[in-house]
Amino acid sequence: VYTGTFDPVTNGHLDIIERASKMYDVLYVTIFINPHKTCLFTVEERMEMLREATKQFPNVVIDESSSLAVEYAREVGAQVLVRGLRATEDYNYESLMCFTNQYLDDGIETVFLMTRLAYTFVSSSFVKEIVSHKHSVEGLVPACVEEKLIEKYRG
């Protein structure tokens, strides 16, 4: 299970998805619905962008959940949570999440994948900021996502 807000999905996310999809028979890429977070895109829009961006990976299942990651993993019968890391800041946060998940369910493992160097600076927030200032994010997000971002920001 690979969870995230994916608002929007970036090429950094896709790097992790592609690599994790080679490691497991099925990879659930799950949009975590956080009622305390304001998103640019609706859940439906994010699902649509993820489906389009991952259509080349036949073993990737796109889903949504408001459950905790370990609860969702239990629901779908998964034993591994995949997390992507860009830098030490990600590690600090993700290690705390890993320990929390171990506390909640010691039978579900967390696997950390370092993103490729080209994507170490890429985040959904960063991408939205760039587009809001009318700059291109080509190479940072799939083309279908860039189109949706431009529609949102430039009307």
Positions of predicted regions on the chain:
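Nucleotidyltransferase catalytic core that binds NTPs
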Residues: 1-155
